[in-house]
């Protein structure tokens, strides 16, 4: 399936609804929908709203109708398209805005945890440098050591280990 990656903090409210323009043929205003949203009625894409709770509150509010009603103004999301969103927890010390209750209520919330076996399977299939895999096998506790109460600006995560792998491979 096609994944349409939309980083909501980079969008404005008008980016969700689109831009109005005058339709001289019908003598009315219509909206030009965002090019990122699928228009093919047979589409089964996944619209991935990434960093949802890092988007400004006005952008989050503009997404209400798209998420709940699968439409924005005149634009209707094709029937086979799914909407998935992701964001950091407030406790992760990221740039986040509290998700408004009406928006939070439009989703099923699933909190993901780092799992060593899942990461090792992923790392093996994605050519993570053998030294990184070897170290993480030796020191499993170092795969993820983020402490939200801590003051360290650097910490180990699966993402940072993939960065180390890239550095070792270059």
Residues covered by each model-derived region:
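AAA+ P-loop NTPase catalytic core and its hallmark functional loops
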Residues: 1-138
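Conserved AAA+ ATPase small/helical "lid" subdomain
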Residues: 120-170
């Amino acid at each position: 399936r096609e994944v349409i990656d939309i980083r909501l903090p980079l969008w404005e409210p008008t980016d969700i609804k689109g831009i109005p323009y005058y339709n001289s043929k019908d003598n009315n205003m219509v909206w030009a929908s965002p090019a990122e949203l699928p228009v093919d009625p047979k589409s089964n894409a996944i619209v991935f709203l990434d960093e949802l709770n890092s988007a400004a509150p006005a952008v989050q509010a503009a997404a209400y109708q798209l998420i709940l009603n699968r439409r924005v103004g005149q634009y209707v999301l094709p029937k086979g398209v799914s909407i998935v969103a992701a964001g950091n927890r407030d406790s992760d010390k990221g740039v986040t805005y509290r998700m408004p209750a009406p928006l939070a209520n439009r989703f099923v919330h699933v909190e993901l945890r780092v799992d060593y076996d899942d990461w090792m399977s992923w790392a093996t299939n994605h050519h993570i440098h053998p030294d990184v895999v070897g170290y993480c096998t030796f020191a499993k506790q170092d795969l993820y050591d983020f402490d939200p109460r801590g003051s360290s600006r650097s910490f180990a995560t699966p993402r940072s280990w993939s960065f180390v792998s890239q550095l070792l491979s270059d």
